[in-house]
Each structure stands twice: as C-alpha cells, then as structure tokens.
C-alpha cells in the first residue's frame, strides 16, 4: 500500500523537509533539511547565513525565494543539481537521525509519495504527486521526485 505524506503534524510528516530535524553540514547546524536545501541554491555567504538563521523552515524558504531578485542563484530550480542537492539533504537528515531512519526503513517495500493533491504549481507537481479522487491510493499527476528520493535514501541507509 502506498504511503502519502504532506504536513509535519500528519502521519509520515517526519519524511518532509519541514520536519524539525537539525542537520550538521559544513561545520554548522541547519534547523531543517529545507533550510539547508534552500541555502545550497546560493553562493553568497550572507544569503546562505540569512537562510540558515531562520527559526522556521518556511522562513528559510521565504528568504531564499525573496533573494532570487537580489543575487544570482547558482542552482536552477528543477535542474539535475537541484535534485542532487535535495537527495544529499534528505540523506544527511536520515543518517543523522537514526530514529527516523528506522521508521523510513520500516516503510519498505511501499511506494512513497509527497501528497500534492489540491496543489497545481509546477514545483508542487515536480516534487510530489496528486491522488486520484476515485482511488486515493493511486497517483494521477506529478513526477513525485521527493518520493523517489526518499525511496533511494531508504535503500542506502
């Protein structure tokens, strides 16, 4: 049976990048994998630090989005490097938190989907998938890149 995750407070919410699992990277602590991922889009140390210092993952995401017009991003959205960066962030999260690594391993062999139902932005459908309203366990639209990353990480850890 497929596993769908969406919000941190819901079942399997620990899979998402907004979940509060700090990550050590480059000698610094990042509050979430989302903050680290967003910072990797930039080369400017001031922007990177501003993203890292945000108290919430949504704050980190908003700073990253607002910085697009200020400085040049080094990573384009939805590029191969963008996906590799996400995979690294997700792998670090699970390597550094054995409690959730064990939970992720326990999902095998189920397919994992980031639930993008009711979201229609290109970015949402890149990372996730929408459910079929007639058969809620089946995806109907979306690349589900995040789910694919989680399943690859599950095989590694």
PLM-predicted stretches and their roles:
Residues 1-157:
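Charged, low-complexity intrinsically disordered segments
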């Amino acid at each position: 049976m497929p596993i769908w995750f969406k919000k941190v407070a819901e079942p399997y919410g620990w899979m998402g990048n907004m979940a509060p699992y700090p990550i050590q990277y480059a000698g610094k602590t990042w509050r979430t994998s989302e903050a680290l991922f967003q910072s990797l889009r930039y080369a400017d140390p001031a922007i990177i630090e501003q993203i890292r210092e945000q108290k919430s993952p949504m704050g980190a995401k908003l700073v990253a989005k607002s910085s697009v017009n200020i400085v040049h991003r080094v990573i384009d959205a939805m590029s191969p490097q963008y996906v590799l960066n996400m995979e690294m962030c997700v792998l670090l999260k699970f390597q550094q938190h054995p409690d959730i690594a064990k939970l992720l391993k326990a999902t095998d062999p189920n397919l994992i989907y980031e639930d993008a139902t009711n979201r229609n932005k290109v970015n949402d459908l890149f990372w996730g998938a929408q459910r079929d309203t007639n058969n809620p366990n089946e995806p109907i639209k979306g690349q589900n890149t995040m789910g694919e990353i989680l399943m690859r990480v599950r095989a590694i850890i």
